Amino acid sequence: IVPQLKLLYNPQMKSAYNFVPGVMGLILMLICAMMTSISIVREKETGTMEVLLVSPVKPLFIILAKAVPYFVLSFVNLTTILLLSVYVLDVPVAGSLFWLVVVSLLFIFVSLALGLLISTVTRTQVAAMLVSGLMLMMPTMLLSGMIFPIESMPVILQAISAVLPARWYIQAVRKLMIEGVDVSLVLMAVSYTHLRAHETLANL
């Protein structure tokens, strides 16, 4: 008997299979969190935010007016990335396209919320850019599994990566898009990993 090694999900060893989910997470996080926070802080710097707040318009509608355009822009970018992945890079969508879009929309919503949170604690555009870059962009690139495998990281970095939304999004996209698994298995895998992360944090 001669054993043979066969790669189940990427037999041709294409690098696009690995970096496409990571690029999706990075671009969506960049557009939603960083651009939203900078846009709102710009209004605070120029003084137009105070004018808007004293106007008859409700604060909720002011926030929605800032967030909805980036939500739409992120959806357009998501569609563009998927089209380029399938028709240019030959990365198939092996699983459910519907659930892939649903998971992506949830991630966009979370990223927008993070951008709004950053805009409330910063007063200048430079500060908003630094906070979103250092607190979101760099961890997303280095600790989300986009470049380096999470399993090879030290335990403390694995615990830190557990709080990054991009980690769970990239993991879900890889399972839905590359592995083609059912969404229930994705939820089970994410829940199990999240539970293990809590146990790791408790033992530190």
Predicted features along the sequence, with ranges:
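Short helix-capping/hinge motifs at transmembrane helix termini and TM-loop junctions
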Residues: R42, V88-V93, T122-R123, I147-S152, ...
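Transport-system extracytoplasmic interface segments
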Residues: I1-I31, M35, E199
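Alpha-helical transmembrane segments and their short interhelical loops
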Residues: P59-G133, M138-M141, S184-V190
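A hydrophobic alpha-helix feature that marks transmembrane segments and, especially
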Residues: L26-T48, L116, T120
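Helix-loop-helix units of permease transmembrane domains in multi-pass membrane transporters
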Residues: I38-F71
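Transmembrane helix segments
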Residues: T122-V163, R167
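Short hydrophobic, aromatic-rich alpha-helical segments embedded in or entering the lipid bilayer
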Residues: V2-L5, P149-S191
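Conserved small/polar residues in nucleotide/adenosyl-binding loops
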Residues: T193-T200
